[in-house]
């Protein structure tokens, strides 16, 4: 993922998180996990996006779905036990990419 693409993906998050995320992007501090996530909707919407979080062993990671329909689709897939590959920024814990793992 290019730095420019990563910077576009952090828009809409709180400014404090964006500031930390910019450092993560410059340092290429990306992490990837493969899990069956438990999605939790967070407070607030931003121009029809849905903010959500996923609990990992070491805390929460935060993401945005483009619409409520996208969020429900991901949530339903996870409920069925589908494994997702998630790339997120190490310190800011913002999800850059999330996709269902295809075996």
Give the role of each language-model region.
Residues 1, 18, 26, 54-56, ...:
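Generic low-polarity alpha-helical segments
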Residues 2-49:
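Structural detector for short beta-strands of small beta-barrel domains
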Residues 5, 35, 41, 80-83, ...:
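Intrinsic disorder/low-complexity segments enriched in polar/small residues
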Residues 34, 51-53, 83-85:
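Beta-strand secondary-structure signal
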Residues 67-87:
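Short nucleic-acid-contacting surface segments enriched for D/E, G, S/T with interspersed K/R
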Residues 89-103:
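OB-fold/S1-family single-stranded nucleic acid-binding modules
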């Amino acid at each position: 993922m290019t730095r420019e693409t990563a910077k576009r993906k952090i828009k809409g998050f709180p400014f404090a998180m964006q500031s930390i995320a910019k450092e993560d992007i410059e340092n290429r501090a990306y992490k990837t996990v493969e899990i069956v996530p438990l999605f939790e909707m967070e407070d607030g919407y931003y121009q029809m996006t849905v903010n959500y979080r996923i609990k990992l062993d070491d805390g929460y990671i935060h993401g945005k779905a483009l619409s409520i329909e996208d969020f429900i689709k991901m949530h339903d897939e996870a409920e069925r036990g589908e494994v997702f590959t998630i790339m997120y920024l190490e310190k800011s814990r913002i999800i850059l990419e999330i996709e269902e793992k295809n075996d």
